[in-house]
Swiss-Prot record:
Principal cellular location given in the protein's record: membrane
Organism: Mycoplasma genitalium (strain ATCC 33530 / DSM 19775 / NCTC 10195 / G37)
HAMAP family in the record: UPF0154
Family: Belongs to the UPF0154 family.
Protein name: UPF0154 protein MG335.1
Localization per Swiss-Prot or TrEMBL: Membrane
TM regions (residue ranges): 6-26
Recorded topology in the membrane: Single-pass membrane protein
Record keyword Plastid present: no
Amino acid sequence: MNDLALALGLGIPLSLLVGMILGYFISIKIFKKQMRDNPPITENQIKAMYAKMGRKLSETQVKEIMRSIKNQK
């Protein structure tokens, strides 16, 4: 009976610790992959995109586009 209690007493916290460490590294890997596949867009990128189309946006229009992108997610 003592052996079972000792095994559970050590096994459960050890399993939780290993799970937390594995979860941390897996989440970091997934986050980096998502950032690589879908990088965040900046105001300068929006300005450059519209400049290529021949339009010059005002600062208000750029802020409005950024707001709409954030609300879309």
